[in-house]
């Protein structure tokens, strides 16, 4: 089991699947690892498909296997992870969000769920409602989560997502006020997102002027959230072409994200490379570097990734990415040293 878990942690999903299969081959009897291995294979297969373009039939097969698992082992608190995976498949891979919503509603009603699990399911359902173009119901759920979790990351994340909904809707000053509160969140990821969004609005908001471009950017990001890429890309090109540098550069970052989501990594890398050299905004340059380094890691161009992380640490030490970049740089160095030792 440890071999499988180590492989998962290293994103070596093929090796993890093989290790899980060896556990399953031993059968159910006197095999305490049987259920974790059944779950692990489903999760690994899903993660494998997410790494590159996949056929709908592949996702249907995983969904069918998840359904089979639930029929065999029941809708119980111990199987919430597979229920959650199945809802994600229906919502975002199989274009059946109504089925996902019904499944999450059923999951939320399972007796004896612990409070954290219940909150995570409600958060997943609120995300789905946002995706289904129902921001009002999503906001209600996020507000409930925020009140039920006033001093933990679940509550902070709900507040962040509620602020993003306000940003999408063009309520810029209210959204910024929420982002400002979240700058001190205990989760570095939430804090970083809040800092960046607050800074973006602050730098581009015109108190006495026209904020239509900023509002267009928010609406376009909502389309990006809903994975409507055919509509998103021309809108981003329009914003890049005619907006001020603050919005144009930010739109370029979002275009790179869109291209990555469509598995057009080479085009995304080219955009990010140009942006890091062109932009005069430090936070934009830092984010472009961080995104580009992540792409280089994905493409196994590890020396280039390491150099980009080094630049973030040395030249952008005040950015929200510097600490994470230092950690990733050390990880890459450790990997190189391991290879040398194995020669």
Placement of each model-derived feature along the sequence:
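Acidic, polar-rich low-complexity tracts and alpha-helical solenoid repeat scaffolds
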Residues: 1-343
